[in-house]
Amino acid sequence: MRAQNNLTVEVDCHSLGSNECPSMTSSFSPMDSPTPTPTSIYSQGSLASPGWQDAGSYPGHAYERHTGTTPMRSAFRLAGMTSNENMAMSYGAMEAQERMPMPDFLSAYDDNVEHFWLPSDAPKTYETGTHSLPYPHTLPQCPPMVRSNYRPHAAYLPEAATNPCLSRSIFHHAERVPQSMSMGNMMPWIPQASESIAPQTIAPSQVGPVTPPPSYSEFPTSIQTFKTHSPTTPLRSCSIGTASGPDTPISRMSGGAADYLEDFQQSPPFRDGLNRLQRHPSRKMIRKQSSRQNMSLENLPSIIKQVQFKCKEPGCKGRFKRQEHLKRHMKSHSKEKPHVCWVPGCERAFSRSDNLNAHYTKTHSKRGGRNRYVATLDESSPDYDPDFRGQLTPDGRPIRGSTLDDPMPDTREYSVDGLDD
């Protein structure tokens, strides 16, 4: 295969005389070229040299060289390669001694290099043709990513993942690279290797209007204006805002929280919710307003007129919803009070039984009052017996076996000590 792929050299000597372009049969060395070559680029310190000049002569490849005093550009052409052959060689099919290690070709690229390799006998430049790519003669814009405080055992991302110049193979065709990824748009934003990035404090007065980069021209036309402001903190910032349109992530970034809050308050969902709250006040507010209105006599509701059961007693304004409630109320106006307190010495009468039971609970079941204490009506007493009807001791304890018709017992006969015996 090597015997078939011979290399020839074609030199454009239109501007030179016949005596200035003599033919030569000596082998070509990239170090002798007056113009920048890949080897001379590596010798400038940008990238590690792959050792092309140390390889000596190349077997199977014949080079022709034309020399002259005037600097000229040499072009090489791979003559023996047909149009249907692929330029890339299978990495697994190459011999071990022909595989070029990636750390020798690119500095700081020492891991995961299986996907990026160069054959040792690959040509240095190409002509513009079917299998051609204009090789950059100088690479001052793409310095290597310098690692400070290099630690050989520390894990880090390969340079191809961080350096945009190494994200694509250098042998890819130019038409495969999109316009947004071209070197012209990328180079002005890549810092030079000689520049040292140091933390700086920028005063608000030093922050001027920020102009968009060239790549922003490819953004949609919805971005019409670029807002700039002077931050209060020593940080450089810019914001991209939209003059109008729906809520987008870009509009959220514009102007900080204040501008976004204004846009949010003007959004249709916010306005609809605010109008809904204004149209439908809460129930608590309605209750408060109605209670304030009901406090005045002029705004009393007409519920009393709907009550049909009224008290017929002169001077009584009692009104009830049910008939039985009216009957119970009428007993309070009558002279009849059939429900009498059985406690000796009280004998208070009530027209209703529920009033009598309330009298027992509130009056005779508590100690220390002016009314007589009855132990049988106290739920916390051991003598509690609500059905007991009989005579009581002076301290309110029941006398078992006595009745209400019996005479009042003598206090000297029924003492507490005598009951305990």
Swiss-Prot record:
Induction: Expression is down-regulated by dioctatin A (DotA), a metabolite of Streptomyces. It comes from Aspergillus parasiticus (strain ATCC 56775 / NRRL 5862 / SRRC 143 / SU-1). This is C2H2 type master regulator of conidiophore development brlA. GO terms for cellular component: chromatin; nucleus; transcription regulator complex. One of its GO terms (molecular function) is DNA-binding transcription factor activity, RNA polymerase II-specific. Residues 228-242 have a biased composition (Polar residues). It is found in: Nucleus. Residues 228-247, 361-421 are annotated as: Disordered.
